[in-house]
């Protein structure tokens, strides 16, 4: 069993974006390829949780396993994706990553995993005053909590965090760059993110 593994969530419908965000162009590749390049530089084992509509396209782009949600919980949001990844790879801790935060840095995963310790169930960054539960780390013991929530048809990350002993980490305290956490939900945000990138 690995100590650390990574789970990339690419199962959302991207309805506000208008096309699958995982496949959006970014720095000569795609969001998903860029994010995986960053993650696999820090983590040996990474799995992508994909929407069935784009699974084959994602598989052609990446060199890591691409799976769908556990059938019983298919389409139940990020909790279903996280627990599906936990079932696929055995690890003590899982670094979670959405497919729509293309600015993420490998430094973030180093910082995040350094913050883990057995007394906590989760390590969640707070960036500009906002919790970022999808750019966080979760201990494998939360798997049972996720199953219990899904059984009760509860799907929110906030409901999971309320049941966990969470170590909240202020981005400023660990020298995390707020730009790493920018997520792209609309075409306007995508255009802005590309502009910001070209201005660097």
UniProtKB/Swiss-Prot annotation:
For this protein, what is the EC number?
A: 2.7.7.77
Q: What is its main location?
A: cytoplasm
Q: Which cofactor does it need?
A: Mg(2+)
This entry's Gene Ontology molecular function terms read: GTP binding; metal ion binding; molybdenum cofactor guanylyltransferase activity
Q: Where does GTP bind?
A: 9-11, 21, 69, 100
Pfam family example for this protein? NTP_transf_3
The UniProt catalytic activity note for this protein reads:
Mo-molybdopterin + GTP + H(+) = Mo-molybdopterin guanine dinucleotide + diphosphate
Paired cysteines (S-S): none
Q: Please describe what this protein does.
A: Transfers a GMP moiety from GTP to Mo-molybdopterin (Mo-MPT) cofactor (Moco or molybdenum cofactor) to form Mo-molybdopterin guanine dinucleotide (Mo-MGD) cofactor.
> Which PANTHER family does the record cross-reference, listed alphabetically?
MOLYBDENUM COFACTOR GUANYLYLTRANSFERASE
Report what the protein is called.
Probable molybdenum cofactor guanylyltransferase
Tell me the organism's taxonomic lineage: Bacteria, Bacillati, Bacillota, Bacilli, Bacillales
Report the gene name.
mobA
């Amino acid at each position: 069993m690995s100590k650390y593994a990574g789970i990339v969530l690419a199962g959302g419908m991207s309805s506000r974006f208008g096309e699958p965000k995982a496949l959006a162009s970014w720095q000569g590749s795609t969001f998903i390829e860029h994010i995986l390049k960053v993650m696999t530089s820090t983590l040996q084992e990474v799995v992508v949780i994909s929407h069935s509509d784009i699974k084959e396209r994602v598989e052609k782009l990446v060199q890591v396993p691409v799976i769908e949600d556990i059938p019983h919980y298919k389409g139940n949001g990020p909790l279903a994706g996280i627990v599906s990844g936990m079932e696929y790879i055995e690890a003590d801790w899982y670094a979670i990553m959405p497919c729509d935060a293309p600015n993420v840095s490998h430094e973030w995963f180093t910082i995040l995993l350094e913050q883990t310790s057995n007394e906590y169930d989760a390590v969640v960054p707070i960036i500009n005053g906002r919790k970022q539960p999808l750019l966080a780390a979760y201990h494998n013991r939360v798997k049972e909590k996720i199953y219990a929530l899904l059984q009760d048809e509860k799907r929110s990350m906030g409901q999971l965090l309320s049941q966990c002993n969470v170590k909240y980490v202020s981005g400023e305290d660990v020298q995390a760059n707020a730009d790493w956490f920018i997520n792209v939900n609309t075409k306007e945000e995508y255009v802005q993110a590309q502009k910001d990138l070209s201005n660097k």
